């Protein structure tokens, strides 16, 4: 089977590499010539565990190719996945210009049946706009060529995307015809031979499912952060509370960890987009507005804890950040809590030293020389008055407290992810602060 994936960013590249791995012939398309040339050389523009090896393996096998020209591959593919970006407009709504550009290109050059599948996260009603854009181009050409549109939202977790795609807990597909359903079944069956967990539904429901899923997860995070902040005020321990409620099978244990807020390319954007979709349809998403407000407040919580610990002001202090990416196992700093924290520290007159196993280049791109970049976690702590854990990378979980005691000037440790044992850190001679206790 031959397919094209338009958009060779995070979603498109993972999708293309994983389909190629099960024997599908895949052409990944992107308008960025430099990106495509690097991909042809096996250079991956993002960090995702296992992705580089998967891309290179399938390139070598001849199942994965890259091009800047969608029109050049249309005649040899039957299914086109659109995985282009949908950046938020100023009002929070999703910008569909790239999605519709892909649709128009398909309509302009297609010569036989195509199934056009939207993989990007898009608002309800986008598939119909895609259908209309393709049909407009066909009408302008005076051609009557059959085609289908479908919705197949991704549910990949950065840092675990390959496993998520190869062994999904479910695949959501919105279709309008039996032919589209048959093609999507054929594509996904190899991933789900032992348990075919493809959930077919109408297209609007599939489009809504993606937004609803991410918004639900964001809600759990903000709820637990709210509970954590209350725990601090009443003398409770949020970790004990988490264990108590997580044991309830109706609730479960996932996404119940308190911290310094969520970030990334999905949750913030999708919550905003769903709020905007509701407004456009005369409805107010009261809960999601609160979720968003709690998260923005939580991104500043480490700064406020530090400001409280140093009652005589932060100016002139040196502060170390362990972790820059919005979560471990990625270099993604989009909407990361670290960015809010760094901005506030710099505004307060602090010197900021940073280290992250993967996001240093991304931080340099965003912040330039505003912060000091260290080569490792202990160099980052050199002469620091305080150390703040922002991203819970594995290498940060068992630090040598004795080394830190010799390296740091001060004794303040603020744990933004509740990784460390309170007694252990305090017995090592540090002033320890965390979230929710």
Where do the language-model regions lie?
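Structural/interface elements that position substrates and couple domains in central-metabolism enzymes
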Residues: 1-437
């Amino acid at each position: 089977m031959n397919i094209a994936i338009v958009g060779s960013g995070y979603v498109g590249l993972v999708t293309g590499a994983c389909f190629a791995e099960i024997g599908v012939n895949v052409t990944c398309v992107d308008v960025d010539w430099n990106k495509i040339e690097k991909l042809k050389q096996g250079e991956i523009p993002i960090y995702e565990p296992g992705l580089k090896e998967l891309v290179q393996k399938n390139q070598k096998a001849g199942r994965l190719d890259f091009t800047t020209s969608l029109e050049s591959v249309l005649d040899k593919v039957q299914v086109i996945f659109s995985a282009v970006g949908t950046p938020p407009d100023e009002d929070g709504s999703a910008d569909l210009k790239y999605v519709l550009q892909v649709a128009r290109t398909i309509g302009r050059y297609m010569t036989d049946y195509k199934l056009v599948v939207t993989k990007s996260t898009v608002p309800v009603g986008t598939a119909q706009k895609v259908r209309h854009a393709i049909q407009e181009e066909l009408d302008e050409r005076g051609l009557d060529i059959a085609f289908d549109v479908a919705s197949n939202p991704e549910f990949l977790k950065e840092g675990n995307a390959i496993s998520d795609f190869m062994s999904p807990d479910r695949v959501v597909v919105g279709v309008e015809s039996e032919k589209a359903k048959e093609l999507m079944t054929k594509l996904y069956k190899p991933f789900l031979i032992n348990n075919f967990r493809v959930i077919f539904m109408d297209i609007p429901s599939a489009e809504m499912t993606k937004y609803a899923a991410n918004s639900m997860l964001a809600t759990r995070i903000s709820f637990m952060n709210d509970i954590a902040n209350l725990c601090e005020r009443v003398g409770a321990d949020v970790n004990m509370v988490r264990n108590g409620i997580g044991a309830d099978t109706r609730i479960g244990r996932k996404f119940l960890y308190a911290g310094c807020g969520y970030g990334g390319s999905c949750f913030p954007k999708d919550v905003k987009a769903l709020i905007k979709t509701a407004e456009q349809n005369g409805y107010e998403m009261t809960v999601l507005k609160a979720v968003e407000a709690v998260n923005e407040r939580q991104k500043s919580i480490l700064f406020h804890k530090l400001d409280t610990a140093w009652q005589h002001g932060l100016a002139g202090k040196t502060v170390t950040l362990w972790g820059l990416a919005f979560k471990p196992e990625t270099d993604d700093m989009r909407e990361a809590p670290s960015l809010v924290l760094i901005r506030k520290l710099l505004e307060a007159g602090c010197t900021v030293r940073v280290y992250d196993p993967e996001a240093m280049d991304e931080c340099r791109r965003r912040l330039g020389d505003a912060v000091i970049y260290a080569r490792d976690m202990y160099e980052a702590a050199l002469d620091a008055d305080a150390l703040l854990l922002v991203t819970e990378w594995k290498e940060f979980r068992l630090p040598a407290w004795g080394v830190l005691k010799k390296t740091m000037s001060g004794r303040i440790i603020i744990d933004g992810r509740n990784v460390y044992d309170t007694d252990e850190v305090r017995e090592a001679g540090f002033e320890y602060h965390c979230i929710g206790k």
